[in-house]
Amino acid sequence: MSATIISGSLIASKFREELKQRVKILSETWMQPGLAVILAGDNPASCVYVRNKAKTCEELGIRSEIFNFPGDISQKALLQQIQDLNVNPEIHGILVQLPLPGHIRIDEVIAAIAIGKDVDGFHPCNVGALVTGHALFHPCTPFGVMKMLAEYDIPLQGQHAVIIGRSNIVGKPMALMLLEKGATVTVCTSRTRDLASHTRNADIVVMAAGKANLLTSDMIRTGATVIDVGINRLADGRLCGDVEFSGVKEKAGYITPVPGGVGPMTIVMLMNNTIEAAERAKAVALAGGWHSSVQ
């Protein structure tokens, strides 16, 4: 058998059309949604990600502002920029591109973002609300994964999902979202002893370990759904995920490719969250309140 390929690119294209309509309505009846992206330093990968986000904003009709700071920016200056954006009524979403320079206290920076503009879903209040199933915004990558699973009608209720990776960005929120849908969730890391004993029992495997080709075909059960969040660059310059794609696709039931899998959905979910933030701000403004942010 050969797995059905879950194309994030195709699903993202479908969502983009829906998002364009929502942006059009907002722009015609209120104001253009606005996203601010803060970049500190010249990390090549971060620069590429920020350009891709700006390009997607332009395609959808979202106003984007990129604040590109040198790598030696002070904590105080960075926090002041965030506070300025928090009270800017034309900015509805604020994203701080990670990683930040080593001298910056990341937790303090993320916590400074107004909750109603935290379109990455990383603010401590949003993370806490995610535990109860009432997050204002869902972190973009796991949110995109959930949309992909839903698009292909992959059942979650009662299914055993194994996540490899425990990051605050993917692994932990992914576990909470799957739990919310009734899955039985096991969280592992790349250092979990006898990792294969866990993955072989999984109906769904989500790879987010950041280790190239970690999951091989002998580590999954026949027909399993395999979601590859990892993106790694090999010595020859090629991109690959955490899954040994050519072998695993011959045994899995569903699988995401790298590139063209989860990546496009992450950006689309960021756009969705930005539009949602603008829609909420509009509702508050029309009700006679201040539409800038929720502090």
Curated annotation (Swiss-Prot):
InterPro entries: Aminoacid_DH-like_N_sf, NAD(P)-bd_dom_sf, THF_DH/CycHdrlase, THF_DH/CycHdrlase_cat_dom, THF_DH/CycHdrlase_CS, THF_DH/CycHdrlase_NAD-bd_dom. The keyword Ribonucleoprotein does not apply. It catalyses: (6R)-5,10-methylene-5,6,7,8-tetrahydrofolate + NADP(+) = (6R)-5,10-methenyltetrahydrofolate + NADPH; (6R)-5,10-methenyltetrahydrofolate + H2O = (6R)-10-formyltetrahydrofolate + H(+). NADP(+) binds at residues 165-167, 190, 231. It holds the Pfam family THF_DHG_CYH. Keywords: Amino-acid biosynthesis, Histidine biosynthesis, Hydrolase, Methionine biosynthesis, Multifunctional enzyme, NADP, One-carbon metabolism, Oxidoreductase, Purine biosynthesis. GO terms for molecular function: methenyltetrahydrofolate cyclohydrolase activity; methylenetetrahydrofolate dehydrogenase (NADP+) activity. It comes from the Bacteria. One of its GO terms (cellular component) is cytosol. Homodimer. NCBIfam families: PRK10792.1, PRK14186.1, PRK14189.1. Belongs to the tetrahydrofolate dehydrogenase/cyclohydrolase family. PANTHER family: C-1-TETRAHYDROFOLATE SYNTHASE, CYTOPLASMIC, C-1-TETRAHYDROFOLATE SYNTHASE, CYTOPLASMIC-RELATED. This is Bifunctional protein FolD. It comes from Nitrosomonas europaea (strain ATCC 19718 / CIP 103999 / KCTC 2705 / NBRC 14298).
